[in-house]
């Protein structure tokens, strides 16, 4: 039971307490490019979770036989392997989404979260905790992207997951010249950073200890 609780802690800490985009401010560059729709955000979150979890597991598994002098090169090779696997998987089964994400799946290898978890956690703990930490970090990254993408897609396109949420009848037309119009700002890249900044601010307020009066 104690072991199970310990394993669960690795996962939950990475998911919320040590959330990489909100607390460590890592992996935020992709928030600019892949959060215009919920579909792309979900896909990127899944891809990063897979790569981070699996690469952390393998790095931990090989930690005792990996020479210190080449450990970062070895970690990059391991990460590259899983990035190639997820990239080929998306191209084979979800080609449209893969085409939309373009080079950003391949650029997961440069994501600070993946290397950060391998270097700071996976090479110091056993494989199962390393995997849970990597998976939690990836999912923590993913839910932040999804939250941003929901707002951007809703107000930028009037849809969520491609389904119409804001009725067409509310939009500006010849019959309704003063109707609703999509917020063009939400489609632009800077909106992702504004929304991420607001999320970081809210999380810091929630996490901040209450001052004693």
Curated annotation (Swiss-Prot):
Its EC number is 7.2.1.1. The chain crosses the membrane at residues 22-42, 43-63, 77-97, 101-121, 131-151, 183-203. The keyword Transcription regulation does not apply. The gene is nqrD. InterPro entries: NqrD, NqrDE/RnfAE. Composed of six subunits; NqrA, NqrB, NqrC, NqrD, NqrE and NqrF. Its main location: membrane. It comes from Chlamydia trachomatis serovar D (strain ATCC VR-885 / DSM 19411 / UW-3/Cx). NQR complex catalyzes the reduction of ubiquinone-1 to ubiquinol by two successive reactions, coupled with the transport of Na(+) ions from the cytoplasm to the periplasm. NqrA to NqrE are probably involved in the second step, the conversion of ubisemiquinone to ubiquinol. It comes from the Bacteria. HAMAP family: NqrD (MF_00428). The keyword Transport applies. It catalyses: a ubiquinone + n Na(+)(in) + NADH + H(+) = a ubiquinol + n Na(+)(out) + NAD(+). Keywords: Cell inner membrane, Cell membrane, Ion transport, Membrane, NAD, Sodium, Sodium transport, Translocase, Transmembrane, Transmembrane helix, Transport, Ubiquinone. This is Na(+)-translocating NADH-quinone reductase subunit D. GO terms for biological process: sodium ion transport. One of its GO terms (cellular component) is plasma membrane. One of its GO terms (molecular function) is oxidoreductase activity, acting on NAD(P)H, quinone or similar compound as acceptor. It is a multi-pass membrane protein.
């Amino acid at each position: 039971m104690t072991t199970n609780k310990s394993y669960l802690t690795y996962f939950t800490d990475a998911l919320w307490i040590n959330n990489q985009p909100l607390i460590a401010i890592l992996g935020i560059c992709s928030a600019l490019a892949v959060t215009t729709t919920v579909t792309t955000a979900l896909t990127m979150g899944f891809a990063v979770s897979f790569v981070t979890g699996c690469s952390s597991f393998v790095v931990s598994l090989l930690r005792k036989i990996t020479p210190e002098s080449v450990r970062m090169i070895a970690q990059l090779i391991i990460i590259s392997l899983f990035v190639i696997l997820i990239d080929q998987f998306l191209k084979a089964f979800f080609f449209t989404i893969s085409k939309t994400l373009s080079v950003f799946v391949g650029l997961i290898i440069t994501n600070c979260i993946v290397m950060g978890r391998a270097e700071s956690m996976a090479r110091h703990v056993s494989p199962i905790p390393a995997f849970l930490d990597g998976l939690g970090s990836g999912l923590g990254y993913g839910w932040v992207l999804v939250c941003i993408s929901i707002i951007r897609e809703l107000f930028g396109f009037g849809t969520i997951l491609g389904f119409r949420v804001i009725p067409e009848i509310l939009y500006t037309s010849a019959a309704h010249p003063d109707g609703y119009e999509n917020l063009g700002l939400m489609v632009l890249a800077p909106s992702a950073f504004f929304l991420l900044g607001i999320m970081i601010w809210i999380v810091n307020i929630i996490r901040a200890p209450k001052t004693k009066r």
